[in-house]
From Swiss-Prot:
One of its GO terms (biological process) is translation. Pfam families: Ribosomal_L33. GO terms for cellular component: cytosolic large ribosomal subunit. This is Large ribosomal subunit protein bL33. Keywords: Ribonucleoprotein, Ribosomal protein. SUPFAM superfamilies: Zn-binding ribosomal proteins. Coiled coil: none annotated. HAMAP family: Ribosomal_bL33. The gene is rpmG. Belongs to the bacterial ribosomal protein bL33 family. GO terms for molecular function: structural constituent of ribosome. It comes from the Bacteria. PROSITE patterns: RIBOSOMAL_L33.
């Protein structure tokens, strides 16, 4: 069986609220860690979300 190209990752808020998004990325083409500015409803602002592993 072939190795899956798409990995599930967790985007964790840098505002230390514990809020996160779950998304997928192609591990073969995107080798660097993802970083997005997304909405954090806990602080009610757009903040940076960085990639972490799902435990």
């Amino acid at each position: 069986m072939a190795k899956a190209a798409m990995l599930k990752i967790k985007l964790l808020s840098t505002a230390d609220t514990g809020y996160f998004y779950v998304t997928k990325k192609n591990a073969r083409t995107k080798t660097e860690k993802l970083s997005f500015k997304k909405y954090d409803p806990v602080v009610r602002k757009h903040v940076e979300f960085k990639e972490t592993k799902i435990k």
